């Protein structure tokens, strides 16, 4: 018996990659995606599964932001690599009462 080689144009298991998406809460969701499929597909599926909006979170791989048009092949991702998910930080104002006001701090000059 001779060993058959995959023919040109025939899809093999190497066309797919298994990726882990790790949330800040420690949860991990696994996805199987084609190496040349835009990661937007994975990102949208993750958001739907977790009940999140794409505007609420950011995806990073090796510390770098991931764009929706990026593919695993472009980012040189390997099987079982992990994508990190971070909640989008909005605002930055101090909470009410944390900044002294003249009524609360009569000894301070403004």
Curated annotation (Swiss-Prot):
CDD domains: Ubl_SUMO2_3_4. There is a cross-link at residues 5, 7, 11 (Glycyl lysine isopeptide (Lys-Gly) (interchain with G-Cter in SUMO2)). GO terms for cellular component: glutamatergic synapse; nuclear body; nucleoplasm; PML body; postsynaptic cytosol; presynaptic cytosol. GO terms for molecular function: SUMO transferase activity. Polymeric chains can be formed through Lys-11 cross-linking. Residues 88-110 are annotated as: Disordered. Belongs to the ubiquitin family. SUMO subfamily. This is Small ubiquitin-related modifier 3. It comes from Mus musculus (Mouse).
